[in-house]
Structure formats: structure tokens, C-alpha cells
Design a protein with these regions (language model features):
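N-terminal chloroplast transit peptides
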Residues: 4, 8-11, 15-21
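Basic, amphipathic alpha-helical/coil surface patches used to engage anionic, phosphate-bearing ligands
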Residues: 18-344
Length: 344
């Protein structure tokens, strides 16, 4: 499909999005206005053109799709273990390689390409250059967002909830080293794009922030455990993208294009699941094109929810997947604050 065809499809999809099927969805009347704005307004068409440019960039798509979704539970083969052992010998003076488990290095062995040693050396150099020191607590979400409060959009529907938040059972654990609650072995993270202000924080800072947390999620938090709901960590992440208060003004395709290639290359196979809600017709229209571009093994990791009952549906799905402790921690953190009674 050509770039022009994709853009045309995006515009048509927005104009006719009320006819598209939703999972568990009952569409609010405001979606008609959102679809019309996206399809006809100057700002809406500009944003869709940016999305189209992103989806039309073959090198970008090829750089993120091979190693985006998490691996299965297949044990390492003899050949893979031999390659890892050989790389360890060649990189015997590399601190990151020496401190990484075989499970961590296995992700790179399976990420494709020849010369595992060279690829491990490259990601080790990237880590030493990009990721801040582990003990630099300024990169904790709580501290980072407090220090940069003026660089995020005010969103009454979200109250004081931060742009990103690890889900932990006890509020007093927030900002510390305690491992987040696990969803099928993956650390659970909430992302709230309604707080995003495009351009307020540069891409390099975003990369350093996410990489600092990614190193913990894929390394330290994959080992050990401190209770029944925290056992079984496998070094992956599951996202809840709470789109409460979000609109086209918060969407930042340019930032995604800057961040995703580096993150998927240096944290391969790290996405376990992603829940995105509430979805309006504009997002669904974009997603209808995304599904044509990305392989099904990637899009299958995403669950899209909409309608007035999306919070209850998501909470119940999480309860069925990993129990009431995780579901009870998630429920007061998603949706408008006036509905949940929480601003934390």
C-alpha cells in the first residue's frame, strides 16, 4: 500500500469510523465530532498525515517489529547457549555482559542477525552512554515528574496522576525499588497520554528516562520475588494506556519514531501485553491502518476497549488473568478521577 493510499484510508476511516466494529464498545455521540475534526480540520489532517508518514517508513517498521513482542517460554537451545558462552568469553571484560543472566542475553541471541558478540558489545556501549546510573534517583517516575511538572499538560479528568506509573500494591512502595505487580510475569505500567505535552521534553531525555526504567524491568525485576503476586517475573512489561483526557493534541508520532527503534533494539522482546482504553473512533481508524502494516504477532498483543464500561471490563480481564490483588491495584488508577475517587 502506498503512502497516499494509507492517508486516504485514514481520512475515510475517520469519516466512516462509526461503522467500524469495537470490542465491548458502545460509542458516545462525541465520537462523531472527533471523527469529523480528524477528517476535515487542518490540525486533524496534519496529525493524520504525521501518522501516515510514520506508518509509511519501511525502515522504521522493519526496525521495531521483529523484536517487539515478548518471547514464548521455549528454553534456550544448545546452540544458543553455546553462542552466549562464546560471547561471554570474547567480552570477558564487559561489566554489563558479565552481570546479565543467560535469559537476558538470550533475547539478543534470538533478535536475529549474525555475530552475537558484536551486538552485545554494541548494546553494552549504548547502555553505558544512554542509561543513567542505577543509583541516580532523579529518574524515578515520582521525582522526575515532580521536577518537570510544568512540562506536562493539565488534565482535570486525570487530576494529579502522573504521565507514567508502575503499578504497586502499596502506595508507600511508589518511587522505590520494589518490583511492580506482575501480569503473567511482566511488570505492569500505566501510561497516560492525556498528560503529554508535545515538545516540552526532548527525545534524548525521554530515552534516558525510559531506558533507566527498562533496565530495571528487564533485569533486576526479572529475578527473585517478594510475594505470591510478584513471583514469576520474566523481564517483560505490560502496558495499560489510559487515554482518559487524550486527544489528537497529545499524539506524538515524531517522538515514537525517535524512541522505538532504540528501545526495541536494546530491550528486545520486552512487550508482553498492551491494553489501550478508552478508544474513540479516531484512534480506531488509525488502528485499522496499523493492523495492515504490523504483523499479527505484534497486533495480537494489543487489546482495545471502549464504551462506558471499559474500566469494569479491563479490571475484570486483569482479575481473570492474575487475580484480585492486581485488579484491585489497577482499578483506582484508571479512568476519570471523579469516577474512581482517587487522584494518586
Amino acid at each position: 500500500m502506498t503512502a497516499g493510499a494509507r492517508l486516504t484510508l485514514l481520512l475515510l476511516a475517520c469519516a466512516h469510523a462509526l461503522k467500524l466494529p469495537f470490542r465491548r464498545a458502545s460509542l458516545p455521540a462525541s465520537d462523531k465530532r472527533a471523527a469529523a475534526e480528524a477528517a476535515t480540520s487542518t490540525a486533524g489532517r496534519k496529525k493524520l498525515a504525521q501518522v501516515n508518514e510514520l506508518l509509511s517508513d519501511g525502515s522504521f517498521i522493519d526496525s521495531i517489529t521483529p523484536s517487539l513482542p515478548s518471547l514464548g517460554g521455549d528454553a534456550a537451545t544448545k546452540e544458543e547457549l553455546a553462542a552466549i558462552a562464546a560471547a561471554r568469553v570474547e567480552l570477558s571484560d564487559d561489566n554489563w555482559v558479565a552481570s546479565s543472566s543467560d535469559d537476558v542475553l538470550l533475547r539478543f541471541a534470538r533478535a536475529g542477525g549474525d555475530n552475537l558478540t558484536a551486538r552485545l558489545a554494541a548494546t553494552s556501549e549504548w547502555r553505558s552512554r544512554v542509561i543513567p546510573p542505577t543509583d541516580d534517583r532523579a529518574w524515578e517516575f515520582e521525582r522526575f515528574f515532580a521536577a518537570n511538572r510544568d512540562k506536562f499538560s493539565d488534565c482535570p479528568e486525570l487530576g494529579q496522576r502522573p504521565f507514567m506509573e508502575w503499578v504497586r500494591a502499596r502506595p508507600e512502595d511508589d518511587g522505590g525499588d520494589a518490583r511492580p505487580l506482575q501480569l503473567e510475569g511482566s511488570s505492569l505500567l500505566i501510561l497516560r497520554p492525556g498528560r503529554h505535552r508535545i515538545g516540552a521534553i526532548d527525545a534524548e531525555t525521554w530515552l534516558r528516562l525510559i531506558a533507566w526504567h527498562g533496565e530495571r524491568a528487564t533485569g533486576a525485576w526479572a529475578a527473585g520475588g517478594d510475594g505470591p503476586v510478584s513471583l514469576g517475573g520474566d523481564g517483560t512489561v505490560s502496558l495499560i494506556v489510559d487515554r482518559t483526557g487524550s486527544s489528537l493534541r497529545n499524539q506524538d508520532p515524531a517522538l515514537l519514531k525517535e524512541l522505538l527503534p532504540a528501545l526495541t533494539q536494546n530491550f528486545p522482546f520486552s512487550l508482553h501485553k498492551a491494553y489501550v482504553a478508552p478508544i474513540n473512533v479516531v484512534f480506531w481508524a488509525i488502528w485499522s491502518v496499523v493492523r495492515l502494516v504490523l504483523p499479527s504477532r505484534v497486533t495480537a498483543r494489543f487489546t482495545l476497549l471502549s464504551g462506558d464500561g471499559w474500566r469494569a471490563a479491563l479490571t475484570e480481564e486483569i482479575r481473570e488473568t492474575c487475580g484480585s490483588v492486581v485488579a484491585s491495584a489497577v482499578a483506582p488508577r484508571i479512568g476519570p478521577v471523579e469516577e474512581t475517587g482517587s487522584v494518586a
